[in-house]
Amino acid sequence: MGGNAHRRKGVDKMFRYVHTNIIAKDASRLIAFYKSVLHCESINETRDLSGKWLDGLTGLNGAHITGEHLLLPGYGKDHPTLEIFSYDTLKEAVPAEVNRCGIAHIAFEVDDVEGTLAEIIEAGGSSVGEVVTTLYPNDLEAVFVYAKDPEGNILELQSWRTRKKASSCNL
């Protein structure tokens, strides 16, 4: 267990967000995508798992999982991670949509939304919608786009900046 666990005042229970899991058709390819395009880093936590304990955990007979944990950009070595795994036997997924119930997307803050979207597309991903810009309180401007990784998982790219105020000149 990492050193940044949270304990609520008066409650003797530990809580800490640890990872998000993606089940991939081709874990090696998807791991390479997240490393090269979205700057996730290997922390040398590869997995090749099987056994009765895994069968019990998953409810699957003969389960076999391979994959890797990747450190998400912007975090120290003490997690959270993106866990990309593949099972020997996969069940086909319903295509992801932004308004589907359940976990909908993984969001990344980037410097250049349009440039990162171009990298995603070049690496086999796709765009879901269009790049949009909107204003938030406190003079914040946000740029957003939804995209899909090469296996169809939805990503949100976002960039935030302080809006430039127009100068007022009195002539």
Protein language model features and the residues they cover:
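Vicinal oxygen chelate
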Residues: 24-29, 44-46, 78-79, 85-154
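Short, P/G- and charge-enriched loop/turn segments at secondary-structure junctions
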Residues: 8, 54-59, 92-96
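N-terminal beta-strand motif that seeds the catalytic metal site of vicinal oxygen chelate
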Residues: 7-31, 41-48, 52-53, 103-108, ...
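Core segments of cupin and vicinal oxygen chelate
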Residues: 23-78, 138-140
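Residue-level preference for beta-strand/loop junctions
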Residues: 14-16, 62-64, 100-102, 139
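Active-site beta-strand termini and strand-to-loop segments that position acidic
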Residues: 70-75, 147-150, 160
